[in-house]
Amino acid sequence: MRFAAAHALCLILGGLTVAAGGDSNSPWHGHGPGAGDECTLVAKGHGIDDAPQLLHAWQKCSTISIPAHTTLNIATRLNMTGGRDKHIDLKGALRFNPDIPYWTANGFPFTFQTQITFWILGGENIVLDGGGLLDGAGQAWYDAFAANASLLRPIIMTLYQATNVLVQDIHMLNSPEWNNFVNEGKNVTFSNINIQTFSTSKNFFANTDGWDIYRSDTVTIKDSIINNGDDCVSFKPNSTNIVVSNLNCNGSHGISVGSLGQFPGVFDIVENVTSTNIQMSNAQNGARIKAWAGPNVGSGIVKNITFENFSELAVDNPVVIDQCYETNATECAAFPSNTYIQDILFKNIAGTGTSTKVASLACSPDGRCSNVQVDNFSLSSPAGAAVYACQNVNLTGNAASLFGACTVT
Ligand SMILES: *[C@@H]1O[C@H](CO)[C@@H](O)[C@H](O)[C@H]1NC(C)=O
Ligand SMILES: *[C@@H]1O[C@H](CO)[C@@H](O)[C@H](O)[C@H]1NC(C)=O
Ligand SMILES: *[C@@H]1O[C@H](CO)[C@@H](O)[C@H](O)[C@H]1NC(C)=O
Ligand SMILES: *[C@@H]1O[C@H](CO)[C@@H](O)[C@H](O)[C@H]1NC(C)=O
Ligand SMILES: *[C@@H]1O[C@H](CO)[C@@H](O)[C@H](O)[C@H]1NC(C)=O
Ligand SMILES: *[C@@H]1O[C@H](CO)[C@@H](O)[C@H](O)[C@H]1NC(C)=O
Ligand SMILES: *[C@@H]1O[C@H](CO)[C@@H](O)[C@H](O)[C@H]1NC(C)=O
Ligand SMILES: *[C@@H]1O[C@H](CO)[C@@H](O)[C@H](O)[C@H]1NC(C)=O
Ligand SMILES: *[C@@H]1O[C@H](CO)[C@@H](O)[C@H](O)[C@H]1NC(C)=O
Ligand SMILES: *[C@@H]1O[C@H](CO)[C@@H](O)[C@H](O)[C@H]1NC(C)=O
Ligand SMILES: *[C@@H]1O[C@H](CO)[C@@H](O)[C@H](O)[C@H]1NC(C)=O
């Protein structure tokens, strides 16, 4: 029955040649869905789960259209991996039904940071666009998390083993957890994404990162607006060749490399990352790099990272390197970080902090940071004269004089 219903909703594009569909041996009447077909989905309504028809269209159609004013009710998980030459034209919405017991038991799990997700999307040559909405229906999750701090909450969209992907002109609302996870991706672009997160109760929308990049190469994130409650963009282990530009981040924890080097025996690489033209407002951090130190941690390399053209407004820590992450001074001196940091540029960083300390570049002892350049800083604080702190690093650049001599531990 579901097949027949799904078929009835698959409209063949005018002008399509017969080669694209209409196999005479197919079980379909007339044109069955085949390569080149466009399928248009209509919500079943009455609380019926639309995930099966969306999955069916993903298997059978090259273009999947969700028209304006159509909200698909996604009540079961979406495994949309291994696709090829797919276009999801989302003008309407996908709303992820907040059935907490269902998702905590059935969300796709990832060992990395113990995450789960509603949706894995992967394969090759995939476009998701159309101006529509991914609605995480997060309020129920924010309220449940307030009562259960170990509650697993689903990421809206995980690009998993995805190559040559474009996500553009998409709104994301109230994710229960991270908004976008790029896991083992290559050549992925996000453009014109509008992320909004808010709570109508007293409970906060925790861990709602904009993007987390992991084991991925060649990722671009640009021209987007993010209003959330955790990292705006986070470069996790093995993020390489990344450009982030023209973002307006509000209320976040900033743009962050790391934390890296946490797990013994694991080597983390973050290399070739540029973040530029960033408006960062009401945030915990602006531009940040953090790496673990201590006795039982991992190792890695952070190399060629540029933070350029940051305009910051009311940011608690506008510029940060913390290479003694989660350790105190004694322990960091005994066990300096094995995640080396080199070739770092902070350039054209302007705006306001919230406390007097507007920059803190704290490296582990024993020369674990090298070639750190600071240029053209223009930061002030409403709390008094701006303080620039540095430790165990030789800074270069025209803003180095603001820092003066760095502490050696
Ligand atoms: C998703 O579906 C593919 C087959 O289509 C399967 O190989 C894969 O294991 C599934 N992934 C998960 C996480 O269930
Ligand atoms: C809290 O969440 C965890 C993880 O999702 C779950 O295993 C546990 O049962 C929940 N606890 C309660 C009291 O609901
Ligand atoms: C990268 O992906 C885009 C689609 O976003 C595609 O147009 C482009 O050809 C891909 N680049 C390479 C080198 O494959
Ligand atoms: C920006 O973030 C602040 C602090 O989190 C919040 O109070 C404010 O409403 C946000 N502004 C917008 C435009 O969303
Ligand atoms: C990162 O890449 C390196 C080199 O390929 C590899 O040895 C390491 O295990 C990777 N780390 C992670 C966290 O995947
Ligand atoms: C970083 O970029 C340089 C210059 O393009 C390139 O040679 C190097 O291979 C890149 N590193 C990684 C890890 O991709
Ligand atoms: C540094 O990374 C950027 C990408 O973020 C890349 O364009 C540039 O070539 C890299 N430079 C070096 C010296 O590797
Ligand atoms: C930073 O801003 C300056 C001045 O607006 C501009 O010339 C430069 O191209 C920008 N840098 C990047 C990497 O966008
Ligand atoms: C530093 O941390 C270590 C390990 O947690 C702890 O044993 C030690 O007491 C701490 N020292 C200070 C000065 O807080
Ligand atoms: C320094 O930053 C200011 C904005 O804070 C900008 O107008 C100016 O062009 C920058 N100077 C250089 C040399 O990049
Ligand atoms: C800073 O430079 C001096 C002189 O070259 C060198 O002795 C010292 O080890 C360097 N410090 C760090 C933290 O790299």
Task: For every predicted segment, state its role.
Residues 2-409:
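Extracellular/periplasmic carbohydrate-active domains that bind, remodel
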